[in-house]
Amino acid sequence: AVGVDPLTMSEETKSKFAGANIALHQSKAEDFESAQRFDEGWMYNCLQHVDEPNKVMAMLVRSADCVRIFEWIDLPVCEGHPHTLRVEQFEQWLPSDEWNYAIWNVGELRLNGNGAAGRYIAIHASKK
């Protein structure tokens, strides 16, 4: 297993990942290159934060036979979130003629009981 994150991690965190046989790469997702193929690619709350979401998704679908994705959608651009993600982008990145969808769920998640909410997309898909 491989983890990619641009943030600096504590030695304790690095040790936990190493103990689970996960090789950590400290780099931006756009800069990560691997000739390795993966059974699954997992992405959680990533694409809003990257500089090039198209490049990240191209790498993911090229490298993995199955993807599990959770991303916030329809949120306005702000500091730290240079993109507004839309369902239509995921439809382009994971076209139904190339992918089988075990889960394709778009919804609203309420947070903290204070009325805060966000729209999300959750996908579990495998290449045909």
Protein language model regions, located:
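A short, conserved alpha-helix within the catalytic core of class I
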Residues: H49-S63
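Short alpha-helix
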Residues: H81-G107
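Local beta-strand N-terminus motif with an aromatic residue
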Residues: F38-D39
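Class I SAM-dependent methyltransferase SAM/SAH-binding core
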Residues: A1-D31
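Core SAM-dependent methyltransferase catalytic element
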Residues: N105-K128
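A conserved beta-strand element that flanks and buttresses the S-adenosyl-L-methionine
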Residues: W42
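Hydrophobic adenine-recognition pocket in adenosine-nucleotide-binding enzymes
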Residues: C46
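Conserved beta-strand signature within the Rossmann-like core of class I S-adenosyl-L-methionine
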Residues: A64-P76
